[in-house]
Amino acid sequence: MIALLDANLFVPTWIIDPLLSLAEAGLCEPAWSARVMDEARLAIMEVRHVPDVRARGFLDAICRAFPMAMAEDWERFEPDVNLSDPNDGHVVAAARRAGAETIVTFNLKDFPADELSRYGLHAQSPDVFLTSVFDAHPEEAMDAMRRLVSSKRHPPRTMSEEIERLRVLRLPLFARRLSETVG
């Protein structure tokens, strides 16, 4: 399943980490465009108060880890998109170009189902998306999350801390699924 990740998902690392960990495990395929990554860079600089070089380095590392995720030549699809906020048309265009089924975003109101259905797309919150991937592949997803948690050094964290932070960051369904699996 190919999922276009919206720029707002890259800002909190506690959210992008599980998404990319499940992708690294082969449970989903992420997609984005240069414009999505540029929006993510600007948001990271603003929210995390880091310089451009640091935000760029973070996103460049993600792009190197997932070289097939970059949707190219999406611009030709943008004029056909009719959203209430025309600044979001590029997200739909990139999703179409990438062959995505899903746009994963916190801004669900910006991606109405009737417009997305014209392109065979739907939008999901990261909570619903992560939970659906977990439900489709529970053992593999749990293994990926264990690897993620054990890899964290700055700061180190336990699975319980990971679950609690995900809950706080508006991922309650996914946090509950992890908690139920851990026991």
Annotate each language-model stretch with its function.
Residues M1-D17:
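Metal-dependent nucleic-acid phosphoesterase active-site entry motif
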Residues N8-L9, R35, K109, V128:
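Alpha-helix/helix-capping structural signal
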Residues T13-V47:
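PIN/NYN-family metal-dependent endoribonuclease catalytic core
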Residues A34, E75, S125-D127:
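Residues at the C-termini of beta-strands that transition into short coil/loop
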Residues A43-A65, A136-R147, S151-K152:
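Extended, non-globular alpha-helical segments
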Residues P67-T102, A136, P156, R167-G183:
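Active-site neighborhoods of divalent-metal-dependent phosphate/nucleic-acid chemistry enzymes
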Residues D88-H122:
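Acidic, metal-binding active-site segment of PIN/NYN-like and related structure-specific nucleases
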Residues K109-G183:
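Acidic, PIN/NYN-like endoribonuclease modules and their adjacent C-terminal/linker elements
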